[in-house]
């Protein structure tokens, strides 16, 4: 799980590529908290906005890996308490409706344009 998982997976892809280990990215399951948050709240969609929107006063958004990981866990806990549908988002990444994804696609992930207007959850658009 990560906030904007596609961004992190791009780093992993390019790190693993010289060692011919890219296939390890096919095995795990992925949960992108950004995709879930986009379905729950209006723009802006930065992690700091999500922390504020859910009133996570203990969460720290310092752009440091450990702080951001802890904040993402707290955010996912809050979103799970709000609506019990996080399992529907596993291996589903919302993409920018105009620009698509950045970087390499992960073969085990379903990518789908995620509209700005929140009418139905992304998983219902598939």
Stretches with model-predicted labels:
Residues 2-126:
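DEDD superfamily 3′-5′ metal-dependent exonuclease/proofreading module
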């Amino acid at each position: 799980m990560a906030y904007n998982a596609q961004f992190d997976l791009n780093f992993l892809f390019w790190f693993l590529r010289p060692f011919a280990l890219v296939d390890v990215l096919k095995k795990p399951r992925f949960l992108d908290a950004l995709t879930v948050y986009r379905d729950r709240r209006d723009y802006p969609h930065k992690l700091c906005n999500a922390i504020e929107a859910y009133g996570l006063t203990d969460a720290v958004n310092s752009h440091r890996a450990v702080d951001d990981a802890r904040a993402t866990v707290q955010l996912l806990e809050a979103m799970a308490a709000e609506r019990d549908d996080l399992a529907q988002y596993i291996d589903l990444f919302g993409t920018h409706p105009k620009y698509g994804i950045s970087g390499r696609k992960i073969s085990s992930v379903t990518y789908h344009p995620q509209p700005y207007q929140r009418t139905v959850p992304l998983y219902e658009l598939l």
